[in-house]
Amino acid sequence: MKIGVYPGSFDPVTNGHLDIIERASKIFDKLIVAVLVNPNKTPVFDIDERVELLKETTEHLPNVEVKAFKGLLIDFMKQENAKVIVKGLRAVSDFEYEFQMALLNKKLEPSIETIFMMTNSKYSYLSSSMVKEVARFGGCIEDLVPEKIAKKVMKKLNKKYAEMEENK
């Protein structure tokens, strides 16, 4: 069985993420969307919320599983018996970072491969950070995140930013 892992923080999941997930799910027998706990980031959505949003978003894809993980991706890959990391690229700047990570992962575990998938051009500008920025200033995010979860995402972001304003 060919198992791929698409890791990320997904805070929140965007239409760009979903595009990569849908396309990668056609390549692998099983695709695991691995939601990482990143100690270098302070997420708006906690790990359970991100996992749940991704499960809702991908429920139409029978070979996709969503799991949270901490620690090294390589250790998670071994635990899941996966051999391929899937990374989405929007721009050259993404490639530079992801290329370094791919080389590091290869150094840590030579049997692991990384494949890069170019984002659909209509999502090349899109990031979770941009979704949060648009929401923060009252913009519409419905075309930026999967329709199925747009209202939940907006509600959470509105609540978060209202709390931030109160604490100023």
Curated annotation (Swiss-Prot):
Marked site (Transition state stabilizer) residue numbers: H17
GO molecular function: ATP binding; pantetheine-phosphate adenylyltransferase activity
Catalytic activity from the UniProt record: (R)-4'-phosphopantetheine + ATP + H(+) = 3'-dephospho-CoA + diphosphate
Lineage top rank: taxon: Bacteria
GO biological process, one term: coenzyme A biosynthetic process
Binding site for substrate: S9, K41, L73, K87
Residues reported in the UniProt entry to bind ATP: S9, F10, H17, G88, L89, R90, E98, Y123, S124, Y125, L126, S127, S128, S129
GO annotations of cellular component type: cytoplasm
Pfam families xrefs: CTP_transf_like (PF01467)
Cofactor(s) required, per the database record: Mg(2+)
Description of how the protein assembles with itself and partners: Homohexamer.
PANTHER family linked: PHOSPHOPANTETHEINE ADENYLYLTRANSFERASE (PTHR21342:SF1)
Function statement: Reversibly transfers an adenylyl group from ATP to 4'-phosphopantetheine, yielding dephospho-CoA (dPCoA) and pyrophosphate.
Name this protein carries in UniProt: Phosphopantetheine adenylyltransferase
